[in-house]
Amino acid sequence: MKLDHVIESQQFTVPLLMELFDRTRQMERMVARGGTRDYADKIMASLFYEPSTRTRFSFEAAMYRLGGRVLSTEHARVFSSEIDVERLEDTIRIISSFSDVIVLRPTEEGGARRAARVSRVPVINAGDGSSGQHPTQALLDLYTIYRERRSLDGLTIAIVGELDGGRTARSLAYLLSKFERVKIHFVSPPELQMRPDILAHLDEHDVWYDMLHDVDPIAGDVDVIYQTRIRPDRVSDRAALSRYTINARLLRKMKPDAMILHPLPRTVEIDKDVDDDPRALYFKQAANGLVVRMALLTLLWDRE
């Protein structure tokens, strides 16, 4: 399967995911040796219309580790051309004429797809809109689980937090639907539940799921808790915040080999005391972003 752009999680088949994960292991070994110069002729344009630290730095570090070069901004909206309201499509046409890949975080949902339609080079969606997708985050999330378990079939996972507009949770749910016997618990305040389009997709692919308002009852049953942010000002019942947070009490209920993941940044939803628990893998998860994105870049270029 040819991969021209990375816009949404639905693009990835299981064979393509396994190929990506094999490449990621190769990238781990390559980084341990100090990187490579194999892609020294490549230029990545890092075009962010919204602020980013982890995603932007991860992509740029990936490019440098591959020997390539980076053109970067996280302030595209305030550049002079953008003050004059230059159309996104015009910007992409120009930037794609002197780069080999564009990593794009647009302000609006669907912006990455619009960019891909006019770009001469691969476009990678680095998170579009407040309720769109973040496919490369989901890829590194899935790789982290796969690397620990060696399988994704039969996984039971709780996805917890603000799910109504969580693009990382949305992208991960799409990827999980590709595997056998997966069970997903969506845990959120009633007003922040996962949106119907994701649930319809899971129904269509016969994926088991339920929707809960407390992580406590299923903490001992899950292989993974994928915790996302939970902002107190978005929860109508502040007293109920503990139902969606991870602390020492919840750790005692979890399996000894369970995993705690978080796309970061966190606020109140994971106590800092949890960081030292061996099941807390969110910093390792973030570090995996480097090698997954290295693998993804090579996958795009090597298939050209």
Give the label of every model feature segment.
Residues 1-57, 61:
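Positively charged, low-complexity intrinsically disordered leader regions
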Residues 202-280:
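Rossmann-like adenosine-cofactor binding region
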